[in-house]
Amino acid sequence: MSVASFFSSLPARPFGYKDGRGRTGMVSTTDIGRRMVKPPVLACRPIESNTYHGSVFLTKSSRSPSPSLSPTPTALDDEIVLDLKPFLIIYKSGRIERFLGTTVIPACPEVATKDVVIDPATGVSVRLYLPNVVDLPSKKLPVLVYFHGGGFVIENTGSPNYHNYLTLLAAKAGVLIVSINYRLAPEYPLPASYDDCMAGFNWVVSHSAGPALEPWLAQHGDFSQILLSGDSAGGNVTHYVAMRADAGVIEGVAIVHPYFLGSEPVGNEINDPANIEFHDKLWRLAAPDTEGLDDPLINPVAPGAPILAGLKCKRAVVFVAGNDFLVERGRMYYEALVKSGWGGEAELVQHEGVGHVFHLSDYSGDISVAMMTKLIAFLKGE
């Protein structure tokens, strides 16, 4: 049975929790006190996970799912329909078990962070990071809209890797960060993730002209300096949003280890057919209606894809890692952008001897420090 036909045959059942991540949904919070940022690794304690950590049921219903945990395993839970470890396993019963990207670190005043629901209908929320501005309360800060990675199927704004990394980045770069907590596949197939991220971006931009929805953005956001960034699937989303934004809104984009694929193996993909097969399955799980690996959503340089000259920003930097399975895809994207006739400034930054999103788990290594220094310089326009 194909993945798509399996999904369509499932009976309507509730998800694990409101946002489809096997945990409680985000809630709106009031403005909190701003204090000096603590070291990210000491910021907050992870929320404890339950026994069926990240497990949910698929449903065909478009309504917001009601809270429930996966029930006691049955015989159907022994039959695996799709094994995509280390990300997730889907069982015949419809239960989904995630192994990565489900731990959540709560927002807390000590690091000047908070969560805000931007769409109650979908539960989509953002996590804001405000650096210490006590001495300069009227200072306006560049606004960085960030999209997390995870292959469109795992991770969230509250995961330790992203919370700690973005806390550190906000403190060092002096930028106000808005991290988008988008819905995940397979419960919410693409284009749900794209739609949520586009909605999050538009929500940020709306503060430049409309009523003050979010005090931190209204008081401290410099909307002449809106930047986008994301890693892996978030790098893919960064490209997606920048292609569809209004002209003149985005100052720059930083695309980190982008999750781009293609039907024809390139570079180190040629000698790794197992990895190609894995990512083909993962992409088709996230996008069951896809045209395949040359779908412009996953291969922006495929024949027929929108020309990259349409990227709506002034500056772009593409980061790639030498040991990353996706390294050649990032290079190809950069080269296609430069050759497209796009009028902005582009730069390719490659780090050797490191793999995919290495910087999220190692903040103090020489290469990680060099990468953050480069990213900060880009965000500041230096």
Curated annotation (Swiss-Prot):
Task: Write down the top EC class of this protein.
Answer: lyase
- Report the EC code(s) recorded for this entry: 4.2.99.22
Q: In which domain of life is the source organism classified?
A: Eukaryota
User: Which biological process, per GO, is one annotated for this protein?
Assistant: defense response
Q: InterPro entries given for it?
A: AB_hydrolase_3, AB_hydrolase_fold, Carboxylest/Gibb_receptor
Q: Name one GO molecular function term.
A: hydrolase activity
Further notes on this entry?
Answer: 6-tuliposide A and tuliposide A-converting enzyme, which are compartmentalized in the vacuoles and plastids respectively, come into contact with each other for the enzyme reaction releasing toxic tulipalin A upon cell disruption by pathogen infection or herbivore predation.
- Please explain the role this protein plays, according to its UniProt record: Lactone-forming carboxylesterases, specifically catalyzing intramolecular transesterification, but not hydrolysis. Involved in the biosynthesis of tulipalins, defensive chemicals that show antimicrobial activities against a broad range of strains of bacteria and fungi. Substrates are 6-tuliposide A > 6-tuliposide B.
Q: What is this protein called?
A: Tuliposide A-converting enzyme 2, chloroplastic
